[in-house]
Amino acid sequence: MMYKKQNLPELTLRGLILGSILTIIFTASNVYLGLKVGLTFSSSIPAVVISMAVLSLFKTSNILENNMVQTQASAAGTLSSVIFVIPGLFMCGYWSEFPLWQTFMICLCGGGLGVLFTIPLRRTMVVESKLAYPEGRAAAEILKVANKDQSSKKGKQGIKEIALGSFIAAIFSLLSNGFKLAASESNFAFIWNKMAFGFSMGYSLALLGAGYLVGLAGAIALFVGMFLAWGIFTPYLSNFEFDSTKNAVDLASSVWSSKVRLIGTGAIAIAALWTLIELLKPVIEGIKEIVKNVKITNQEKNERTNIDLSLKSIFILFVLMVVGLFITFYSFVEDANLSIYYQMLFSFVGTLVSVLIGFFVAAACGYMAGLVGSSSSPISGIGLIGVIISSIVFLVLGVELFQDPMLSKFAVALAIFTTSVILATAAISNDNLQDLKTGHLVGATPWKQQVALLVGCVFGALAIVPVLNLLYQAYGFVGAMPREGMDASSALAAPQANLMSTIAQGIFHHNIEWGYMAFGVFVGILMIIIDKILKGTQKMSLPPLAVGIGIYLPPAVNIPLVIGGILKYIVMQHLTKKYAKNSHKEEKLASCEQRGTLFASGLIVGESIFGVIIAGI
C-alpha cells in the first residue's frame, strides 16, 4: 500500500462536490443506456481520470482524495442497476407515473444496505483474499501512475478523450434526435415464401461505444442471438401468421415482439441462473477459506487503513434504513385499499424479504465481483431469483386474496417492488468491495470510503428519480407508453425489467405463453454447452447471456453494439502488430486500450446526457 504511513486529506469538501457532480452525470448516462439496451458501464475509471484532471488544479490534491471521488462516483454505475427492475411496475400496468419519493427510498435504502452489509466482509474478502478485483486493481494502477506524474498529464490526456467522445456523440444526437436532420435508425424487411425477414440499423454512437466496451466475444454472441431471432425464428413463426394485408415490416415486428422476444426471455433467464450456479461453488469455498485464515493483531486494528465504520454507526444506519423501507412498503401497499391486517403483513414481509435476501446476495455479489469483476457479475440473475422468491412468498400469503384480478396486479407489482430493493442492495455490494480494493492498494482509510459510498448512494438516488421520470415521459417503455399517439418505435426496451414483469405476471396470472419461454430455455442451454466447448479451446467464448439479449433486443440496438465490439478487436490487432517489436509493448497496448475505453465512455456519456436533456425539453 502506497500511503499507509501518511495521513493525507481524503474526505474533502471539494472532493465531495466533484464526486456528487460526477455521480449525477454518470447516473444519468447509465440510466439512459440501461433502459435502452439493458447494459451499464463502469464509471470508476472515467471518474478517476476526470478527478485527476480537475483536482490537479489544486496544489494540495493527492491520490487519496482522488480515490474518494471515484469511490463516490462509482455508485452511479451500480445503483442505476435498479432500472433493471423498476420499469416493470409500468410494464405490468400498475404504475402510470413515478411516485418520486418511493423510488428515491428504494434506491437510498437498498443501496445503503448494500454498503452496510459488505463492511464486515472487507477484511476477509479484500485484505486477506487473493481475489482479482479487476476494476479495483485497474483504478488503483491509474491512480498510482498518475500520482508519479506531478503535472497530471495522464489525467489531462484522459479527460480529452472523454470530452472528445462526448462532444462527437452530443453533436450527432442533436442532429438526429434534436433537429431530426439525421435518421436514428433504418428499417428493411421483405416477405419470401410467406416468411417475413426483417432488419433494422441503428445509428447510435452511445451503442457503438458500449459495444467497444463489450468486446469481441460479446459482439459475436449478440450477433448470434440477432441471427437466430431474425434469420430463423421470426421467418419460421411468421409463416404461421402470414397476413397478406400486412406489410413485411409490420408482420416481422409483430411476430418478433409477441413470440420471439419470449424465446429471448427464456434464454436470458437460464443464462443468468447458470452464471449464478457456476459461481456458487467457488463463492462458498472461497468464503470458507478466507474466514478460516483471517488473523489480525491488536496493532493492526488501530492502524488507519484497518478502521471501518463503527458497529454503533452501522447499527444506527441499519435501523434507520429498515424503518425507512418499512414506511416505503407501507406507502406502496396502502394504495391497494387492503385491510389494515394485510397492509401491515405485506409491509412487514416485503421489508423482511428485502433485508434477508439482500444480506445473502451482498456477500455473494461481493465475492463474484472479486472473482470475475463488477461488469461480469450476474446482477440480472440476482434480480431473477429475487422476483421468483418474492412472487412465491406473496402468492403463499395471499393465495385467496389474489384471485381478484385487480389485487393480482397489485401482487405482481409488490413482487417487483420488493425485487427492486434487493437489486439495489446487490448492485452496490457488487461495487463496494471493488472500491475498497482500490483503497486498500493505495492506502485509503476504509471508513472514509464507506462514508463516500453512502454519500454516492444519496446523490445517485436523487439523480435516478428525475432522470427515470424524464425518460419515461419522453420515450415511454416497451408496452407501457405514458400517452396515446406516442411513437412506439422510440420506446425504451428495458429488457431486464420486461423479463421480471413477465416472470411475475406468469406466476400470479398463469397467462404466460410458457412454450416459447421453455424453448428459449432450451436455446439458452444449447448456448451454454457451446460456450463450454469453445472455452475448452481457450481461443474464444460465446457468452450465453449475450446471445439471449441478442434475441431479445431489436437489430437497431444490436448492430451498433456488434460493430463496436468488432471495431475494438480490429484496433487492438492493428496496435499489437504496430508495437510487436517495441520493448515497452505491454505498456503501450495498455495505454492505448485505456484511451479507447475513455473515448468509448465519452460517446456513451455525450449521447446519454443529451438524450436526457432532450427528454427534459
Residue ranges and their predicted role:
Residues M1-I617:
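Alpha-helical multipass membrane-protein architecture
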